[in-house]
Amino acid sequence: MDERNPRDDVARKVELSWLMAFYGGMLTDKQREVLTLHCEEDLSLGEIAQEAGVSRQGVHDMLSRAAQKLFDMEARLGVADRFSRMQHGLEACRDALRQKRYDEAEQLLNQLIALDQEDDHGL
């Protein structure tokens, strides 16, 4: 019996969709199609298998390989994480400015500039 939490499945699908926005171009067309059907259209493995003309096991294997590729790309490059940190920093800076906390806004802006200038991954 499958003991996975449905919330974990939803969280994983959301994370994979997020990573596809950054690294989807690194997947094959078939991997991208299967991931889109699974994560964004919420189709079951059986439904995807029928639509794609492959076995359920084939869909499972393709999803596993595609997900692993996305996670590996993010582990190596960190583009999605960096984008998220920038976005949150910008929102915090904007909020500080709106509330006239100028010293805090300046500190946040300096942190954003430092983040922008990071070159940890050779980008």
Region locations from a protein language model:
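Helix-turn-helix/homeodomain-like alpha-helical modules used for DNA recognition
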Residues: 85-123
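Short, Lys/Arg-enriched N-terminal segment that forms or immediately precedes the first helix
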Residues: 5-23
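Short amphipathic alpha helix immediately N-terminal
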Residues: 29-41
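Hydrophobic positions on the alpha-helical face of helix-turn-helix-like DNA-binding modules
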Residues: 48-49, 59
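Residues within the DNA-recognition helix of helix-turn-helix
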Residues: 62-65
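C-terminal flanking helix
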Residues: 67-74
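Pre-recognition alpha-helix immediately N-terminal to the DNA-recognition helix
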Residues: 18, 32-33, 92
